[in-house]
Amino acid sequence: MSSESSKKRKPKVIRSDGTPTEGKRNRSDTEQEGRYYSEEAEVDLRDPGRDYELYKYTCQELQRLMAEIQDLKSKGSKDVAIEIEERRIQSCVHFMTLKKLNRLAHIRLKKGRDQTHEAKQKVDAYHLQLQNLLYEVMHLQKEITKCLEFKSKHEEIDLVSLEEFYSEAPPNISKAEITMGDPHQQTLARLDWELEQRKRLAEKYRECLSNKEKILKEIEVKKEYLSSLQPRLNSIMQASLPVQEYLFMPFDQAHKQYETARHLPPPLYVLFVQATAYGQACDKTLSVAIEGSVDEAKALFKPPEDSQDDESDSDAEEEQTTRRRPTLGVQLDDKRKEMLKRHPLSVLLDLKCKDNSVLHLTFFYLMNLNIMTVKAKVTTAMELITPISAGDLLSPDSVLSCLYPGDHGKKTPNPANQYQFDKVGILTLRDYVLELGHPYLWVQKLGGLHFPKEQPQHTVMADHSQSASHMETTMKLLKTRVQSRLALHKQFASLEHGIVPVTSECQYLFPAKVVSRLVKWMIMAHEDYMELHFTKDIVEAGLAGDTNLYYLALIERGTAKLQAAVVLNPGYSSIPPVFRLCLNWKGEKTNSNDDNIRAMESEVNVCYRELCGPRPSHQLLTNQLQRLCVLLDVYLETESHDDSVEGPKEFPQEKMCLRLFRGPSRMKPFKYNHPQGFFSHR
């Protein structure tokens, strides 16, 4: 290779300062492009392994030539210049070979990169296609899920059952031979039948609407006719007023009252209806009326009107409210007044008794508490002289107390009210009963209200059956209460004058001559009764409640004085009075130290039925007092006389007794046998 390269002549290079012509430049470019492309083609034909071996060989030759040149130069002889030149030429040839190999390597590298880039582009294209396919798969899966979860409108339609469908649907819709085995066709057929039924119902609906419009037109015509009749009827009613007054048939007044009753709250309305029905059916003397402002009652049901004030007025109001801010006490008072507010209308019942006395009952309804209250007043045909001891008999606070046992009307019957009271600081309703009335349980029942204690409810509906079941019994109890109180009122007037009134029907219960007499009859307070030493057993037994009335009677005969403490239950005369005795004669004697005093108490407390007299037993109290006078006579007359004392006996025996004493306790004969007129033991 070195000999061939040395024989070749170097090409001449012509350098010139001027710029080559255009034709020469184009020809050189064409040659370069051809050479470049020939090298690229040669790269495809050459083996990279052989080029690598050629590269290693060329490098070794260059190393060898460089070493020889260095050795020749180190000798320093003149003959070696030609050899050095030859070796230099050979080295240049090897350098040309390395350059060519370098170019080929770069071309291979470029082709490899291009191929790698093309392969990468293909991989990216395939990856993008894969991503697109995965997205399409995911989208299709979502659509499939939506399709599976899709609920058709027909599933919300309540179709008829299969039995009803095949029994009622016509054959052209049911198609039993097709739909029996195909659920899809069966559902379509059922939907067709549903559509057919709805079309029929729609047709019927249109017919009903047309009929409704016709009926409405007829109603309007009749309303116009009736409205034209109203003025005529009013004139007829106005003209018939004198006839109604003459025949005692106040139809116009009753009509107005019924119109007013429409504005009553439900409990008062139930009371009004049931009391009116009871008066018409059972008691003609019972009169029912409505009092109060109808306009205020109507205003309760009207929605508040929106008032739009000017800005100046609103600013003035804001300034006033900021300047005058109510205190906490004023706010609580306003809340209490609002909670205890009564309905504007009330129901008045006038219950007439046999002696022409009238019990006036005014029923109120507390709207926020949902309870009813009552105020009572008794009027008599003749003005009564009120004795001192009868002051509480006809008082509105006690005349209706305990009409039913335990119903004193001092606390609310609605358990839910206590929670309402706690919010506004009301401890009990007792402080407001004089102003509002008493919320007795029987009043709630007359209004149809029932409050269960187990489950307190804020709202309780009025029930007509509840009112009707208690109306008759309550009216009878009210009449009995008024008659018994009036009878006691008259009896107390005599008792305060020391006279025990005994009617002719009860004269047979006592002997003809009674020496002991009543000298004092007075009312006493509950606290004073509790302090008496001979009434402790009554107090401990719980018979001395604060709703009872307490009296003290003093019976005298000579030096003997008998004190009788009387407990009068509000339910008198159904519940008898209870007596406790204390005899001051030869010492103080009570039921704790004298068996005969205990026997005297038993005669009036236990054997009271003998003293009731004719019904309704209003003479029981006076008969008991008269019996006490007789018992004191027997006690004193049967007492043994001390022989050491000279002179006549203080209490000579005037009563006929079969036997003066009996038993070791020396009991006296206190039982009076009225046909024979003698006394005996029980």
Swiss-Prot record:
There is a cross-link at K153 (Glycyl lysine isopeptide (Lys-Gly) (interchain with G-Cter in SUMO2)). One of its GO terms (molecular function) is mRNA binding. Pfam families: FmiP_Thoc5. Residues 22-42 have a biased composition (Basic and acidic residues). It is found in: Nucleus; Cytoplasm. The modification Phosphotyrosine is found at Y225. Residues 81-247 form a coiled coil. Residues 2-144 are annotated as: Interaction with CSF1R. One of its GO terms (biological process) is stem cell division. The modification Phosphothreonine is found at T327. GO terms for cellular component: chromosome, telomeric region; cytoplasm; nucleus; THO complex; THO complex part of transcription export complex; transcription export complex. Transmembrane segments: none annotated. This is THO complex subunit 5 homolog. The gene is Thoc5.
